Regions:
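A structural signal for multi-pass alpha-helical bundles of membrane permease subunits
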Residues: 2-283
């Protein structure tokens, strides 16, 4: 059996590997090369060195988008994981209808980001108009919290499922031992459940942080970066630089921003994984 698997292994792997190289590796390498070029199309790319990176890093809109994205990532990560964990704790108690509640909370995750963006744009603008407040296109504060609400509504159910699975995998023996030792519910949560859930926290934090930094379609549909790029996140800023600005130089600058963005997300994600996985070892 093992000989047969080894014999036919390349046959099954090569198509997937070829598709991965053609669809990801080669475009990624080409994208890095183009970030050092001035171009309109790939065929007329002209090497100009690090000029695109200098212009990208000195672009005020890129810096403002970075600050906005970091603030959004921090707030959304804390809210999503805090609320999802609280709901998971409630749904792992002995109560009727828990499966129905899990399904209802998870359903928003199945809706596309563009659709959600337009739905929430209508809802939030209706609320703002009733309160005699400026609409999203003229209200950066409402735009920020609108994206936060949208992201939480979409992601909480997914993270809740991960936390529920983690809570259900806590060994009953540990809970019984804690009860025998006289630990109350809060002590059991802090001393027993949380250490056993570090792997779940690692996954959920990784997903929420990366999703927050990569957010594009919801941002495009809900605010489009208005007013005056005040609610423009990094992904949308890169898109607007590449497609919405006139001039051949902006293509290369947009590509340089994309490479910087990729490095930023990788560094932050790996740092978070290292920090939380070290807690798993201690646990």
């Amino acid at each position: 059996m093992e000989k047969a698997l080894k014999k036919w292994f390349p046959v099954f792997v090569l198509p997937t590997l070829a598709a991965f190289c053609v669809g990801f590796i080669w475009p990624f390498i080409q994208g890095i090369y183009l970030s050092f070029c001035q171009f309109i199309t790939v065929d007329n790319a002209k090497w100009i060195g690090v000029t695109n990176y200098v212009r990208a890093l000195t672009d005020e809109t890129f810096g403002d988008s970075f600050v906005f994205t970091v603030a959004f990532a921090i707030v959304s990560t804390l809210l999503i994981n805090g609320i999802a964990f609280a709901i998971a704790l409630a749904l792992t108690k002995e109560m009727k209808g828990t499966n129905i509640f899990r399904t209802v909370f998870f359903m928003p995750n199945l809706i596309g980001g563009i659709v959600l963006g337009y739905i929430w744009q209508i809802l939030i603008n209706c609320v703002l108009s009733n309160l005699a407040q400026p609409l999203l296109a003229l209200n950066s504060t409402a735009g920020f919290w609108g994206i936060i609400i949208l992201m939480c509504w979409q992601q909480i159910g997914y993270m809740m499922i991960i936390y529920v699975a983690g809570l259900q995998n806590v060994p009953p023996d540990l809970l019984e031992a804690a009860a025998i030792d006289g630990a109350n519910a809060i002590q059991t949560l802090i001393k027993v459940k949380l250490p056993m859930l570090m792997s779940s926290f690692t996954i959920c934090l990784f997903l929420t942080i990366t999703n927050s930094f990569k957010l594009f379609d919801q941002n495009l549909a809900l605010t489009s970066g208005e007013p005056a790029h005040a609610t423009e996140m990094l992904a949308l800023n890169i898109y607007n630089t590449f497609y919405s600005r006139a001039g051949a130089q902006w293509k290369g600058i947009g590509q340089a921003k994309a490479v910087i963005f990729f490095i930023l997300v990788v560094v932050i994600s790996l740092s978070q994984l290292y920090a939380t996985r070290s807690k798993e070892v201690q646990a």
